[in-house]
């Protein structure tokens, strides 16, 4: 069993605010704007004044596409160009990842393995490795040093597992994982990225 860096995996997390910010930022940055409403100038029809300005006793209107009318345009609606992006500094993201990893480590949800046991790029090879670890086949996050063709072939069709490199770790995936499996050779890259000794 490899020793985990206490600066990454044993932080005392007394305030979850940064983890929450990073989690929400991930969701916001994954969001795209598709909803769009029609303003009064974009709704078809309504070119004719519905009734004369004076003498009817009714309120004056210039178009049946006024936003307060049924079938009228929408005032202040979605334009389809909304920007939901939330920004966090690189340092804040890394600290949030370390806090999330520490929280998972406290719950004994992190396991270290020598390798995934992949020889022929078969899914059953990875399934066997995970079965030997006695982990529940649900929401497993696997951290590997590098992605190669065999690894991709062996893991792409496993619905309950997600494979990432250390520098692609994020708070959303960590917090949603029931088990995090880290390949031993990925630990040094993870240390270097999070502690900032070098850019991996």
Please give the residue ranges for each predicted region.
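Glycine/serine-rich anion-binding loops at beta->alpha junctions
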Residues: 40-77
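Extended polybasic, low-complexity segments that bind anionic RNA or targeting/receptor surfaces
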Residues: 1-32, 79-200
């Amino acid at each position: 069993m490899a020793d985990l860096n206490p600066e990454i995996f044993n932080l005392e997390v007394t305030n979850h605010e940064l983890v929450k910010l990073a989690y929400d930022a991930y969701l916001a940055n994954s969001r795209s704007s598709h909803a769009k409403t029609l303003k009064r100038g974009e709704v078809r029809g309504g070119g004719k004044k519905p009734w004369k300005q004076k003498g009817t006793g009714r309120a004056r209107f210039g178009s049946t596409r006024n936003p307060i009318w049924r079938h009228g345009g929408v005032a202040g609606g979605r334009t389809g160009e909304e920007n939901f992006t939330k920004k966090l500094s690189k340092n804040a993201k890394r600290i949030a990842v370390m806090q999330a990893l520490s929280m998972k480590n406290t719950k004994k949800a992190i396991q270290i393995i020598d390798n995934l046991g992949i020889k022929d790029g078969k899914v059953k090879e990875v399934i066997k490795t995970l079965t030997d670890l006695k982990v529940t086949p649900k929401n497993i996050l696997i951290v590997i040093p590098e992605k190669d063709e065999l690894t991709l072939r062996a893991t792409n069709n496993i619905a309950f597992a997600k494979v990432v490199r250390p520098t692609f770790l994020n708070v959303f995936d960590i917090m949603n994982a029931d088990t995090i499996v880290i390949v031993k050779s990925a630990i040094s890259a993870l240390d270097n990225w999070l502690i900032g000794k070098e850019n991996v």
